[in-house]
């Protein structure tokens, strides 16, 4: 779990690093139009949720297309989705996980200090800095889900090809003299008596410590793309050999026998998996955030233009006024280039799929 947090933080810093100064107003079309804003004695050239960009900072840094794009994207997200109680709650959990990780290490950890400093640079200050960004992340998830749901039949085809499943895991660490309750025979009896899911929850501490599951033993979404996973203590990803077996299973099925896997540090585990769900629509609407998030990611990853389509869709519903002509030009150019690249990737993917189908037919 901690490694997942570290990876997310790395992405968080990358994204935040690209959020810079830009002269742009974005607000809902049905709201009043704002011509100018001030905060104290400074002119505000952008007001996006709680983030304010001041005019005297506008030209401190070189106008960069990546910077402009991420500012544009952040603005569209924040103005397109209201901050619901559910989003606040989910963002708070994300914030607490990040804070907990660093405070377990060192409250003065240089990475944590760097994160707070970077957040401050972009206007996210005080105790709520990380939470404000987390809210933006959760808003984007909600917008993606709405769009995918509306266009589900068209988008699901590429996801179906990956045979997605939601699974539970039980890991037993190999020991010379394991306690009775940690033996394969004992756990087999529990599975037969109480069912796989209840037993997985009882032994979830092992998989949770490996960063693989929640405290109920739920790993969540997996598909063919994870068949090549390496198993390391730092990867927080299910071993590829387990995924390969899961891909051959149906809903309600579990491993008949225990599978032995060894991580990169030489630790060996006995593993069993259970397929809880194969219905993609149900996974998209799961009560578990991890299942939903990974399902959404699969839709985005397997439909190359989807990210651009979603952004364009919500941006079209907003009133966008650029105070800086160069900014408008750079953003427009960036968006066109991004869509062009996405279409090229989609064409290449389709060609590869056709070639594979031809090979299999022959």
Question: At which residue positions do the language-model features occur?
Answer:
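Solvent-exposed, polar/charged alpha-helical surfaces in well-ordered, non-transmembrane soluble domains
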Residues: 70, 74-79, 92, 96, ...
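N-terminal targeting/tethering segments
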Residues: 31-132
């Amino acid at each position: 779990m901690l490694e997942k947090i570290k990876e997310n933080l790395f992405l968080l810093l990358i994204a935040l690093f690209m959020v810079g100064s830009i002269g742009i107003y974005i607000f809902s079309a049905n709201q009043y139009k704002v011509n100018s804003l001030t905060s104290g004695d400074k002119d505000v050239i952008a007001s996006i949720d709680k983030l304010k960009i001041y005019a005297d900072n506008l030209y401190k840094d070189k106008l960069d297309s990546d910077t402009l794009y991420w500012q544009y994207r952040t603005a569209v997200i924040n103005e397109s989705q209201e901050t619901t109680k559910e989003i606040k709650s989910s963002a708070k959990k994300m914030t607490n996980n990040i804070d907990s990780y660093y405070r377990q290490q060192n409250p003065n950890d240089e990475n944590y200090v760097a994160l707070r400093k970077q957040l401050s640079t972009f206007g996210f200050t005080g105790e709520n800095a990380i939470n404000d960004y987390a809210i933006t992340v959760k808003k984007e998830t909600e917008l993606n889900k709405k769009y995918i749901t509306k266009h589900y039949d068209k988008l699901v085809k590429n996801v179906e090809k990956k045979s997605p499943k939601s699974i539970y895991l039980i890991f037993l660490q190999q020991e010379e003299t394991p306690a009775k309750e940690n033996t394969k025979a004992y756990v087999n009896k529990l599975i037969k008596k109480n069912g796989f899911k209840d037993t997985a929850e009882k032994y979830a501490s092992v998989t949770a410590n490996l960063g693989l599951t929640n405290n109920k033993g739920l790993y969540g979404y997996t598909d063919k793309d994870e068949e090549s996973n390496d198993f390391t203590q730092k990867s927080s990803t299910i071993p590829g050999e387990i995924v390969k077996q899961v891909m051959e299973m149906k809903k309600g099925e579990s491993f008949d026998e225990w599978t032995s896997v060894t991580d990169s540090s030489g630790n060996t585990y006995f593993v069993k998996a259970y397929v809880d769900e194969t219905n993609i629509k149900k996974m998209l609407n799961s009560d578990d955030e991890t299942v939903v998030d990974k399902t959404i990611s699969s839709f985005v990853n397997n439909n190359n233009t989807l990210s651009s389509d979603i952004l364009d869709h919500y941006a079209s519903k907003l009133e966008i006024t650029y105070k800086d002509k160069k900014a408008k030009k750079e953003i427009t150019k960036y968006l066109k280039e991004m869509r062009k690249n996405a279409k090229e990737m989609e064409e290449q993917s389709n060609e590869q799929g056709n070639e594979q189908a031809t090979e299999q037919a022959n």
